[in-house]
Regions:
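Transmembrane alpha-helical insertion/packing segments
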Residues: 1-62
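Loop-to-transmembrane boundary segments
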Residues: 4-16, 76-95, 138-141
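Membrane-interacting alpha-helical segments
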Residues: 5-9, 113-134
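Juxtamembrane "helix-exit" motif on the non-cytosolic side of transmembrane helices
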Residues: 24-37, 98-108, 134
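Membrane-helix interface/capping segments
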Residues: 54-88
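Cytosolic juxtamembrane helix at the C-terminal end of the final transmembrane segment
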Residues: 61-66, 143-176
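Hydrophobic alpha-helical membrane-insertion segments
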Residues: 83-116
Length: 179
């Protein structure tokens, strides 16, 4: 169980980043609903900022783990970023599954699933603009895709950091290297 006790802080930070970005995305999309061009800008900004925050945080965790591994104090665990993303995104996947249930007609869970789908739309506010523009709000597979997207970014960021690959080289330089 050291897998879950070691990265507790980082997993909580992933969840907090999602909540903050959801509020940001929801507020910006609701403020720009009347204007499609502004909604597009806000959707791109919300998704881009979310991807940057998650990728950068996981890159730093991967880089720190690499330093510890080089010093012999850490053994590489390929499942670590995946499990962190699943724990932080448990609400996302649960909500996505409930959205799927909401689409099955005449089920006992229909009302509960619709309530859960609306809660998910609040949790995924940073994707709301893009999904709204694509007119796919009622397609439950879109919400599962959104939940899977966060897992993909988390795994890519961690592995890039662990291998020392940087998409923005100046962002991950030390002070000595910048001068």
């Amino acid at each position: 169980m050291t897998m879950f006790s070691d990265p507790k802080y980082e997993t909580a930070k992933l969840l907090l980043n999602q909540i903050v970005m959801s509020v940001f995305g929801y507020v910006t999309v609701m403020a720009t609903t009347a204007s499609v061009p502004l909604t597009i800008v806000c959707a791109v900004l919300g998704i881009g900022l979310y991807v940057f925050l998650i990728y950068n945080m996981m890159w730093e965790i991967g880089a720190k783990d690499r330093i510890r591994a080089d010093a012999g104090r850490y053994e590489y665990k390929a499942k670590k970023p995946f499990l962190m993303a699943l724990v932080a995104g448990a609400l996302n996947f649960t909500g996505g599954l409930l959205c799927l249930l909401a689409m099955i007609p005449n089920t006992v869970c229909l009302n509960i699933a619709h309530v859960a789908a609306n809660i998910c739309k609040l949790l995924w506010g940073h994707f709301l603009g893009a999904v709204k523009l694509m007119l796919m709000l009622e397609n439950p597979f879109v919400w599962l895709l959104v939940a899977s997207f966060a897992v993909l970014i988390t795994v890519l960021g961690y592995n890039a950091g662990y291998r020392g690959i940087s998409l923005i080289p100046s962002l991950h330089k030390s002070k000595k290297d910048r001068e």
